[in-house]
Amino acid sequence: MAHQFDVVDSEIVLEAPIIAVRRDQVRMPGGNVSAREIVEHFGAVAVVAADEDNRLYLLNQWRQAAGQRLVELPAGLLDVADEDPLEAAKRELVEEAGLEAESWSLLTDMFSSP
């Protein structure tokens, strides 16, 4: 049996250029109401770029949230109006790595942490 979670109230508690935070009041299966904070985000793309020897191209970038430089895939926000995710991935690969790919395949479409 699937549980029902009804939103009984919702408010935006933070609006910023690339995120918003929404607080929903959710009626749980037992009847209690509980607050749930949801980060609303444009979404993002990441590119696994491999050369002819199957070596991956990685970047070393400062990430303020981590307080350090991280090794990561070329990636970026879906922040251009009406831009297809594949076009965003192509744009980010050029912007961040100076590369253009010969072929493209979708590996996954997912929530990183809903």
Question: What do these predicted regions represent?
Answer:
Residues S10, L59-Q61, D109:
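Residue-level detector of high-confidence beta-strand sites
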Residues D9-A46, E52:
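Acidic, metal-coordinating catalytic segment for phosphate/diphosphate chemistry
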Residues A20, F42-G43, R63, E72, ...:
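Active-site segment of metal-dependent pyrophosphate-handling enzymes
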Residues A2, R36-R91, E95:
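Conserved Nudix-box catalytic region and its N-terminal flanking loop in Nudix hydrolases
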Residues M1-A2, E15-A20, G67:
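A short, polar/charged loop/turn motif at coil->beta-strand junctions and beta-hairpin connectors
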Residues M1-E11:
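A short, amphipathic edge element
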Residues V7, V21-R23, A35, L59, ...:
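Hydrophobic residues on conserved beta-strands that form the core of alpha/beta folds
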